[in-house]
Amino acid sequence: SLGLVGSEMCIRDRDGWTFPNFDYDGNFNDILDKIYNCNVYIGHEGIEGCLAEGADVVITGRAADSALFLAPLKYEFGWAADDWDNLARGIMAGHLLECGGQGAGGNYMYDWRNVPRMDELGFPIAELTDDTFEITKAPDCGGIICEQSCKEQFLYEVHDPANYLTPDVNVDISHATITQVGDNRVRIGGVKGKPRPDTLKLCVGYHKGWKTVSMLSFAWPDAYEKAQYCAEVIMKKMQRRGMKADDIHISYIGLNSLHLGVADMSEEALKNLNECVLRIAVFSEDKSECAKIIPEISPLQLNGPPGASFFGGRARVQEVMALWPTTVPRDAVQVESHILEVK
């Protein structure tokens, strides 16, 4: 038996909803005719319903990651819909499992050099009792389960430890305990729950414009100086061509492409670089404006500063799909589940 879970809502039948953007001020009406998709983060109910009807496998649309774990836990243990503490424990157990190997030493910042057998990294396992739960892993897999690795996973994506909002429960981990109780075994306690929010997270994807990204690498000596000068050359060429970009972002991979304004750009850091990659990203609502930069990049291997190489293939114009993160009233979303018998 195959369980199918989906949800429906009408974005145009808004009844006064304003869909405020989490990230910046904006008017939802401005993107209404540019929308490609809408995904509501639903909770565990539809999945649990399929399990109750005998589903062997459940396929769902967008759901909160931790809901995939809460549903079978609630179904098996028979937790009540308002048993907020147990629901919160189930959510946090799922939270520690949902990223796979990340919960067992992958992406581990504290002591990544000493994670055993990362080439054979296993996934974490949650074992729940009445009031606590433990995280472990299969003994024949690589990785590590320790207090620090679980703390990193426990806190990721959590803005307010006293109010971690999910579709199923408002989780309070502000007094949670994480204790090493054995080799590759950690016990979690003190997780509490409060009534779930009245809204659900809604992610709206919409057309925003166009972009192109070009890169040129430069070798020692004076790698950064040459890359910087090449950026000036490109900008002068674009001015002559009358390019009207809405945004141009110039960065130097190996220097500031990740750290931006806090990167070390001192003379000492720059003078002996073995190599430096110039990255120029252009954004415009007009596709033709983005295209103007493309034919100017490749010739700069020979028509620009010395020691340049062009890589990654010829740049191309790509559509930009932007995200409008917001919320929608819970009662506006209809969750449906069906059972399909497959032979």
Show which residues each predicted segment covers.
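C-terminal non-catalytic interaction/assembly regions of soluble proteins
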Residues: G189-K343
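A glycine- and small-aliphatic-rich helix-loop capping segment at beta-alpha/alpha-beta transitions
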Residues: D15-W17, P72-D83
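Gly/Ser/Thr-rich loops at beta-strand to alpha-helix junctions
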Residues: S1, R62-L68, E285-K287
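Gly-rich Lys/Arg/Thr-decorated short loops/hinges at beta-loop-alpha junctions or inter-strand turns
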Residues: R14-D33
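Active-site glycine-rich loop that binds ribose-phosphate moieties when present
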Residues: N37-L51
